[in-house]
Swiss-Prot record:
Protein's name according to its UniProt entry: Methyl-coenzyme M reductase I subunit beta
Pathway note: One-carbon metabolism; methyl-coenzyme M reduction; methane from methyl-coenzyme M: step 1/1
Pfam family, one: MCR_beta
Annotated organism of origin: Methanothermobacter marburgensis (strain ATCC BAA-927 / DSM 2133 / JCM 14651 / NBRC 100331 / OCM 82 / Marburg) (Methanobacterium thermoautotrophicum)
GO molecular function, one term: coenzyme-B sulfoethylthiotransferase activity
Additional notes on this entry: The MCR reaction has been shown to follow an ordered bi-bi ternary complex mechanism, in which methyl-SCoM must enter the MCR active site prior to CoB for a productive catalysis.
Source species taxonomy: Archaea, Methanobacteriati, Methanobacteriota, Methanomada group, Methanobacteria
EC number assigned by the record: 2.8.4.1
Amino acid sequence: MAKFEDKVDLYDDRGNLVEEQVPLEALSPLRNPAIKSIVQGIKRTVAVNLEGIENALKTAKVGGPACKIMGRELDLDIVGNAESIAAAAKEMIQVTEDDDTNVELLGGGKRALVQVPSARFDVAAEYSAAPLVTATAFVQAIINEFDVSMYDANMVKAAVLGRYPQSVEYMGANIATMLDIPQKLEGPGYALRNIMVNHVVAATLKNTLQAAALSTILEQTAMFEMGDAVGAFERMHLLGLAYQGMNADNLVFDLVKANGKEGTVGSVIADLVERALEDGVIKVEKELTDYKVYGTDDLAMWNAYAAAGLMAATMVNQGAARAAQGVSSTLLYYNDLIEFETGLPSVDFGKVEGTAVGFSFFSHSIYGGGGPGIFNGNHIVTRHSKGFAIPCVAAAMALDAGTQMFSPEATSGLIKEVFSQVDEFREPLKYVVEAAAEIKNEI
C-alpha cells in the first residue's frame, strides 16, 4: 500500500508524455529499480586510462605533477596488449564466472570500463573496493603480461594508482571514479553528494535535463542515506525529486518552453505562481493594496513547485547567457524574488538562498577559487541545501558553451569517455521514468 496519495504524470526529455498517474513512491530510491541500478553502478564502476598508464611508464612521470623519476622509464606496449591485460584483470576482479563483473575496452584499447562485482560490496563497509580492487588487478595483469621485474613493479603500481598511500587521494592515478574518496566526506551519508558537477555533466554528454535528473537522483538518494528523507520529510524529498529532477507533470519543460525565447527569472516566477494557483497548490490568503499574500495547505508540494521553477529559471537564464557563471545569482535572486512575490518560503525553506550567497562569493567574487562545475553537494560552500541546489548547477554547466576554465572537458574527460558508455548514466531520466511506469501497479 502506498504511503502517499500523490500521483504524477511522467515525461521524457522532449516533453512527450510517457506514463500518466504514476504513484510518487514509484520514483523513490527505495523502490525504483533504475535508481537502484544507477546508484549501485556508480559505486562499482571505474574508468581505467590504459594509454595514460603506458605514457606514465614511458616517461617515468608518476605520482602527480612535478614528479619524474629519471632512469625508471619502462617502454611497455600496454594499449597494444590491452585485450590480454583486460582479460587477466577481469579474472582477478570477478568472484564467479557468471557474476556481474564487466571489463570492457574502449577507444581501441586506450580506455577500459570496469564494473566490480556486487559480491565484493556485500562484504564491504563502503565503496573503496571498486578503485582499489581494479587498480590492484590491472597492476598485476601488466606485471604478468610483460614479466616486469620485482625492482620495477613499484613503477607499475605508481602509474596505475598514483602516489597513494603517501597521499590521501590517488594522486596522479590513471583510474577514475565518480565517487570521491571517503576521507573527503563532510559527514556521514555524504558519499553520493561528493560527485563533482562536471562529472555528472560529462556522463550525460551535456544534455541539460539528463544532467539535472542524474544530479537530482544522487542528491535526493543521499537524503535517504543521511536520514533526512524519513518520516515527516520523506514526501518533501520525493516531491522535489519528481518535480525538480524528473520533470513531473512536465512542469520544468513547460516553464522553459514558455520563457525560453524572451523570458527572465522574473517571468518564470510569474508563470510558476500562476501554475501553482491553477493547480490548487497555493491560494490568495490576503489582498493588500496592489499586493497579494499567498498561503498553502501543502508546503511540501509548494516546495516542489518552487524547486521546479528554480530549475526552469536556471535553464532560461544560463541558457540565454550560454554561460554557467551566473548560476549562483539565479539561485539567490530567484528565491529572494519568490519570497517577496508570494510571502511563502523559498526553495528548501531558505537553504538554497543561503547556499547561493556563499556560492556566489566562492565561485566568482573577491575570492574566486573555482567555477561552478567543480562544486558538489559535499562541498562546504554548497552542502547546506538538502538536494535542491546542485541539480541546478548541473543544468547550468550542461548549458555552458565553453566559457569556463574548469569545464567538463578539462576536469572530467576520462569520466565522459567511459561513464557515458553506460546507458543509465547517460540517460537517467529515460530509464527511471520507464522503471516507474513498470512498477506503478505494485505501489
